[in-house]
Amino acid sequence: MTANQTKKSVPSFTSDIRQGVSNEGCLVLYSGGQDSATCLAWALEHFDRVETIGFDYGQRHKVELECRENLKQKLIQNFPDWAAHLGEDHMLDLAVLHQVSDCALTRETEIAFGEDGIPNSFVPGRNLLFFTFAATIAYRRGLRHIVGGMCETDYSGYPDCRDDTIKALQVAINLGLERRLVLHTPLMWLDKASTWQMAEEVGGKELVEIIRQESHSCYLGEREILHDWGYGCGHCPACELRAAGWESYQKSRS
């Protein structure tokens, strides 16, 4: 098997994780979006103790934060074995990001791409801060593993979603805390179709349906229109990416 095939193979990756850390605890960066919801389910399947952390950073729409709680409750109701492993939720106020960031996720600005190819939905430093605060909570809670839904395959040009960024951040965090925390990004080499597939492998069609209906990706906060792939405006980059992934996922199953 080539290195590229290994990166894109969900079964081989999940098997490797299952061997080493299932008896430990982790902290999941959980926003209520498709990626973080998939990572939460993945963590509940692979770790004995799972806590979550979310951030209110002055987003244009609070819909994702509302979906965050609804989706978690659906997981608790439909997956009682997971519910036994789900612990405390930590919600942090990072309103300072709204003060220092002028982007389409924190301002009423039309989504567009800059000359460098990075969309103006990029919040500079967001994931750097998220992981740093998560590491602080993990340190205090005695959790060695932190799970995030960053993805380089579908990362829309966000530099803080790159594998190199996360690896460098892990080194910096461990030096600064004098710990050996592990930053897990199980979606890093998966496209959106493979992310849907991963959800099915972790929790079956029931989990896929929960993520489809309860998670939120739309940059415009649209929750009135239910498409085959979930709620959203259908036109923003996040909706287009999610829709294309769903279509590819469905084709792979036929």
From Swiss-Prot:
Superkingdom as given in the UniProt entry: Bacteria
Query: Quick one: which residues bind ATP?
Result: 30-40
CC cofactor: Zn(2+)
| One Gene Ontology term of the molecular function aspect | ligase activity, forming carbon-nitrogen bonds
Keywords from UniProt, A to Z, are: ATP-binding, Ligase, Metal-binding, Nucleotide-binding, Queuosine biosynthesis, Zinc
Identify the residues that bind Zn(2+): 218, 233, 236, 239
Q: Name one Pfam family in it.
A: QueC
> What does the record say about how the cofactor binds?
Binds 1 zinc ion per subunit.
Quote the EC number. Answer: 6.3.4.20
PANTHER family in UniProt: 7-CYANO-7-DEAZAGUANINE SYNTHASE
- What is stated as this protein's family in its record? Belongs to the QueC family.
Name of protein = 7-cyano-7-deazaguanine synthase
Species for this entry: Zymomonas mobilis subsp. mobilis (strain ATCC 31821 / ZM4 / CP4)
Q: Which gene encodes it?
A: queC
